């Protein structure tokens, strides 16, 4: 199975996001990308929508519930939110939704900054492996992978999807 083209998915996501925001009568959402791939997707979505507002970025490393098991990611960077969260309509963007734990961590962090009016979740891919009841409002595509497979977004220019096989060589 070949992987979809991220640029095509983002174009369709922009159409779907515009319609979603219009239905909800949201006119000036604030975009927030989850590092790293979510930031790239958020930048591309903003470009497709002609939105030139500042982009917020989240690094959820300290908010993850598996922090004590997996340790700290070697490239932790501070979150940057160049706008107030309180009362804002947010578009939270991630590249790959798998378990839902990254989104849960992102929501926890956002609520530490204030109470948004709403949060719209936009994801490039859903791997249909959810452990938590989290679903995107706007989605590029759903992929079903074998348990030993993952997909990674590479970029930022060009954005590309890469399949990764986590199975030990002896298991193949």
UniProtKB/Swiss-Prot annotation:
Annotated function: Regulates the transcription of the pyrimidine nucleotide (pyr) operon in response to exogenous pyrimidines.
Recorded GO molecular functions are: uracil phosphoribosyltransferase activity
Q: Which principal EC class is assigned to this enzyme?
A: transferase
EC number(s) per UniProt? Answer: 2.4.2.9
Catalyses which reaction?
Answer: UMP + diphosphate = 5-phospho-alpha-D-ribose 1-diphosphate + uracil
- Read off the SUPFAM superfamilies from this record: PRTase-like (SSF53271)
Keywords of the record, alphabetical order, are:
Glycosyltransferase, Transcription, Transcription regulation, Transferase
Put simply, this protein is called Bifunctional protein PyrR
For this protein, the record's Gene3D superfamilies field holds:
3.40.50.2020
Q: Where is this motif: PRPP-binding?
A: 90-102
Give me the gene this protein comes from: pyrR
HAMAP family xref list: PyrR
Q: Describe the family membership recorded for this protein in Swiss-Prot or TrEMBL.
A: Belongs to the purine/pyrimidine phosphoribosyltransferase family. PyrR subfamily.
In the UniProt record, does the keyword Transferase occur?
yes
GO biological process, alphabetically ordered: regulation of DNA-templated transcription
Q: What is the lineage of its organism?
A: Bacteria, Pseudomonadati, Pseudomonadota, Gammaproteobacteria, Pseudomonadales
């Amino acid at each position: 199975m070949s992987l979809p083209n991220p640029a095509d998915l983002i174009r369709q996501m922009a159409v779907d996001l515009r319609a979603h925001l219009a239905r909800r009568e949201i006119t000036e959402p604030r975009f927030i990308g989850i590092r790293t791939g979510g930031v790239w997707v958020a930048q591309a979505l903003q470009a497709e929508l002609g939105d030139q507002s500042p982009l917020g970025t989240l690094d959820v490393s300290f908010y993850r519930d598996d922090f004590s098991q997996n340790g700290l990611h070697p490239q932790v960077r501070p979150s940057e939110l160049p706008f107030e969260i309180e009362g804002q309509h947010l578009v939270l963007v991630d590249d790959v939704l798998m378990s839902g734990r990254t989104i849960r961590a992102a929501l926890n962090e956002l609520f530490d900054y204030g109470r948004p009016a709403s949060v719209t979740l936009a994801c490039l891919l859903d791997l249909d492996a959810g452990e938590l009841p989290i679903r995107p409002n706007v989605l590029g595509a759903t992929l079903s992978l074998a348990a030993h497979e993952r997909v990674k977004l590479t970029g930022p220019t060009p954005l590309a999807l890469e399949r990764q096989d986590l199975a030990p060589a002896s298991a193949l």
